[in-house]
Swiss-Prot record:
Heteromultimer composed of HisG and HisZ subunits. It catalyses: 1-(5-phospho-beta-D-ribosyl)-ATP + diphosphate = 5-phospho-alpha-D-ribose 1-diphosphate + ATP. It is an enzyme of class 2 (transferase). GO terms for biological process: L-histidine biosynthetic process. Its EC number is 2.4.2.17. The keyword Transmembrane does not apply. Belongs to the ATP phosphoribosyltransferase family. Short subfamily. One of its GO terms (molecular function) is ATP binding. It comes from the Bacteria. GO terms for cellular component: cytoplasm. This is ATP phosphoribosyltransferase. InterPro entries: ATP_PRibTrfase_cat, ATP_PRibTrfase_HisG, ATP_PRibTrfase_HisG_short. Its main location: cytoplasm.
Amino acid sequence: MLTVALSKGRLLKDFIKFLERNNNHVWADAIIHRERKLQITADSIKFILVKGSDVPTYVEEGIADIGITGSDILKERPNRNINNYIDLPFGECHFSVAAKPNVTNIQRVATTYVKTTRDYFNQKGTDISIIQLSGSVELAAVVDMVDAIVDIVQTGTTLKSNGLEEREQIGEINARLITNKHSFFSKSKAIENFIQQLGVSIHAQ
């Protein structure tokens, strides 16, 4: 049996929609009707539901054979002992720098994504101070704790409703399928079958 780690939250909703579009209702229904269970089994696949940033850890430690997570998570810690295998056609969004309309000088930036933020401003040759937050990043700009934020944007609605505007898009994000390195060989056929059931080309990058 394969164990697949799924990100809870927005990406899980996108995954369910993707399954439904591809008529994979067995998996979709099992996930939708899981109630509060953190692990479920459907069609010989065990799905475990974890925080998005923890998906690579469960895969790396061998608890899960496969993980589905956002490329944003993988960019923050790129040197994990996993196979960063293929792109998946859902979960599309982007990183953006956002600020109040009247802000002209960005020196302090709040974000959850410290590496992405530091790399971007270093490439621009801009010296900034980074404040790391784990949630509600927009609030830091709203209350003037920082000049700007770097966060994931899908529709921009949350930014606009809090009086912020996108200044620059700094990187695209999508879902990625990752595998445990040992499972990649010991369960190669099962992994290949899982990907085929998703309706995704193994060679799609």
